[in-house]
């Protein structure tokens, strides 16, 4: 008999639509329940009422005695063909944390949730894993169940008396959910275990001791069965999974089946999982319900997994360790670790199909960026008015966008200094701290374009046109110059930086200046063309040399840049 329970929880594994059009974050927890007659004793203010399902099996509707009425259940058909009751338990009913909840790991295997503080365990024995919704959990081989209201019991032959069998074996089919739970995790009992199940594990068998709310202890034995009973039959695969559902999801990687399709406008993108579709839909709606709680950080994200990854930019946590002996590197996400491992194995699974190319890549991102070299596609567009620059890579757009803002997203983990570009941060760490460790660019996943009015606000640009002078290049006091070839291939432009007062003192001739933000003297960029014309562009603190080139180019073409530049 299965008890299927759904809890509203901010860290839920799935979402079901609720009343009022709002989505409810829920978790689905399947456990076995002990039946004694037609109802069960009250446990921590909750009671269970037996209900016979359509297939003849028995399920239980959980009843919160404080409400004075039963919470209505709903029959659902599970992926493996079985049926169970689902019920919504409000978050305040002290059942929001469910131990024994089955979740799918990134490799397709099943783990069972136990809520506890990671800091209470030896960190060397804690392994980070990524769940299917992108969040990170930690595996420990000896954990303590903290909940005092966990419903965890088994049913044999329909009565409690059937449990008093001593050394007798229990049919695994009648206790499948609990047996899987025991086969996966061993739990060390301790003080304050209350009414929880205490499970001790040996190599040959699983010995389980069930502690009910009234204190009766029912020792039993259950033979350990195969943990992964569902095998992939595709040639060359043979992967094993604990449930039919997880096998079915895995098989989509062979078949290419993507049953979840986006119906927003003309999008029609399809996904292998409902969670993937839900995350994608938020790119259309702009919904970002997961907000960073760090002080002075206003970023929010489409998924809880993205938020969790972002938080590590504040904490510096790198829970995913490279398993290769002697490497010692660790990473903020399991995907970055997976790509890193390929530097040890030499694996490059992504091959370019362009005739005559033959290049292969370790990561899907690098492969996609490479393909755009052949196609000429530049899908990433700068949203700042008047810019309209396009890029083949998202990382290039991210790096470009900081020229429009005061943002300095890269911070030194040694001294706290912040930088606009990751290359500048890397140079600082090498020279100031002798740190040559490569810097991950995963922060780029959390780039949120700044609104155009925020970019325009505070912009101070002055440009001077029509400055006559000798052919050639005017050098700065430091003598630094940069040559640039125009698009026509003939007009050589030299870029020279000097301050505005020096420019006025050294040059004579008609000048036309436009000050958009103030009269203060700021450094300018002087561009001298081969035809004798020179253009000086004064840029604000948030502008860059790249912006100066763009503005000067428009001036040389006869345009008059306005505020939108």
From Swiss-Prot:
Keywords: Activator, DNA-binding, Metal-binding, Nucleus, Repeat, Transcription, Transcription regulation, Zinc, Zinc-finger. GO terms for molecular function: DNA-binding transcription factor activity, RNA polymerase II-specific; RNA polymerase II cis-regulatory region sequence-specific DNA binding; zinc ion binding. Signal peptide: none annotated. InterPro entries: Znf_C2H2_sf, Znf_C2H2_type. It is found in: Nucleus. The keyword Metal-binding applies. Belongs to the GLI C2H2-type zinc-finger protein family. This is Zinc finger protein 143. It comes from Xenopus laevis.
């Amino acid at each position: 008999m299965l008890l299927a329970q759904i809890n509203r929880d901010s860290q839920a594994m799935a979402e079901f639509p609720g009343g009022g059009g709002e989505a409810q974050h829920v978790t689905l927890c399947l456990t076995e329940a002990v039946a004694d007659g037609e109802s069960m004793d009250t446990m921590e203010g909750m009671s269970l009422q037996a209900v016979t399902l359509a297939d003849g099996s028995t399920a239980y509707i959980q009843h919160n005695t404080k409400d004075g009425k039963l919470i209505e259940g709903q029959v659902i058909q599970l992926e493996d063909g079985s049926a169970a009751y689902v019920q919504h338990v409000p978050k305040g009913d002290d059942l929001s944390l469910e131990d024994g909840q089955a979740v799918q790991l990134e490799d397709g295997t099943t783990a069972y949730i136990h809520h506890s503080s990671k800091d209470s365990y030896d960190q060397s024995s804690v392994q980070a894993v990524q769940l299917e919704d992108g969040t990170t959990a930690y595996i420990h081989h000896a954990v303590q169940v903290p909940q005092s209201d966990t419903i965890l019991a088994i049913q044999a032959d329909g009565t409690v008396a059937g449990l008093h069998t001593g050394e007798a074996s229990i049919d695994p089919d009648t206790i499948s959910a609990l047996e899987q739970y025991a086969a996966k995790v061993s739990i060390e009992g301790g003080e304050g275990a209350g009414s929880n199940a205490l499970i001790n594990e040996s190599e040959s068998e699983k010995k389980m001791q069930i502690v009910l709310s009234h204190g009766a202890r029912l020792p039993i034995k259950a033979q350990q069965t195969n943990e992964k009973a569902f095998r992939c039959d595709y040639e060359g695969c043979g992967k094993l999974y604990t449930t039919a559902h997880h096998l079915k999801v895995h098989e989509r990687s062979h078949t290419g089946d993507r049953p979840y399709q986006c119906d927003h406008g003309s999008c029609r993108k399809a996904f292998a999982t409902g969670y993937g579709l839900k995350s994608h839909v938020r790119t259309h709606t702009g919904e970002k319900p997961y907000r960073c709680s760090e002080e002075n950080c206003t970023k929010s994200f489409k998924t809880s997994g993205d938020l969790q990854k972002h938080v590590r930019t504040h904490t510096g946590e790198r829970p995913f360790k490279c398993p290769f002996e002697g490497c010692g590197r660790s990473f903020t996400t399991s995907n970055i670790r997976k790509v890193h491992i390929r530097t040890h194995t030499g694996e490059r699974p992504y091959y370019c199909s362009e005739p005559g190319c033959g290049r292969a890549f370790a990561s899907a991102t690098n492969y996609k960026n490479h393909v755009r070299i052949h196609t000429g596609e530049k899908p990433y567009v700068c949203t700042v008015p008047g810019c309209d620059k396009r890029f083949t890579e998202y990382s290039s757009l991210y790096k470009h966008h900081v020229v429009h803002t005061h943002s300095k997203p890269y911070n030194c983990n040694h001294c706290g200094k912040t930088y606009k570009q990751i290359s500048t941060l890397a140079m600082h760490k090498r020279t100031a701290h002798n740190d040559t460790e490569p810097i991950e660019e995963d922060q780029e996943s959390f780039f949120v374009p700044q609104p155009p009015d925020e970019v325009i606000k505070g912009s101070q640009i002055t440009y001077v046109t029509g400055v006559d002078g000798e052919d050639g290049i005017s050098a700065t006091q430091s003598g630094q110059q940069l040559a640039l070839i125009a698009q026509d291939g003939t007009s050589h432009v030299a870029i020279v930086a000097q301050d505005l007062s020096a420019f006025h003192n050294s040059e004579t001739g008609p000048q036309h200046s436009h000050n958009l933000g103030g009269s203060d003297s700021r450094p300018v960029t002087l561009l001298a063309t081969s035809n004798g014309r020179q253009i000086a562009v004064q840029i604000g603190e948030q502008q860059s040399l790249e912006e100066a080139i763009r503005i000067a180019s428009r001036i040389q073409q006869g345009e008059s840049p306005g505020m939108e530049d």
